[in-house]
Amino acid sequence: MSIDYYIKHFVDNFIIRCGTILGICSQVIFDYRITIRFEAFTCAFITGRMKKRFKCFGKSKICRSVDFVNPQYISIGDGTLIQNHCIIEAWVFSKSYKGEIIIGNNCAIGEYTHITAANRITIGNNLQTGRFVLITDNSHGKTDGSDLDEAPSKREIISKGEVCIGNNVWIADKVSIMSGVKIGNGVIIAANSVVTHDLPSYCLAAGTPAKVIRYFK
């Protein structure tokens, strides 16, 4: 990666960290009502400084301590909230793997959610996630175990395919959604599930690996 990439990444994170420091100071110094207003100001400050760096950015909000990698390959619609401590990465490793992330309108990305793309991740409208959710279209290393003698950081990045999440989906805490998965509209995924296969619309899924346990329509 070029020196320009590292400079831009440093500047992006510096802006976000400044907003984070402002938010933390408000919690220490002021009472609850003032803190809420200060949090809103912090989000507005971070969003205002960051939004021009994205491929497309609607009328949405970024909270403090959010880490973006290559936001020029990330699109976010209107009315979406990226909550504290999220990591959203669009990796560019080669011509074969050039990550892109598209997040729709009116989504709420819960705290500590990690979205990482080396291929493409598409999220529809009105997504709600809990905390500590992982959405990934890639992994380190081959599934046949032929590269286990290499350090994980040096193994080839592999993607089984794009991740596509439909509209009005609810993803509970600590769910992992793996590469090559398509999730339909109106799906509910129970906490701690690992999604490795497609899920049809209007169902409740749970487990490791996640299975449909109820259909709503």
Q: Where are the regions that the model predicts?
A:
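A short, flexible loop at the N-terminus of ABC-type nucleotide-binding domains that lies
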Residues: 179-180
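A generic "structured core" feature
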Residues: 184, 188-190, 194
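A short acidic, glycine-rich active-site loop
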Residues: 151-163
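Domain-scale signature associated with acetyltransferase and cell-envelope carbohydrate enzymes
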Residues: 1-137, 162-168, 175, 185, ...
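Short, flexible, mixed-charge acidic loops at enzyme active sites
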Residues: 141-151
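Active-site nucleotide-sugar/metal-binding loop of Leloir-type enzymes
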Residues: 197
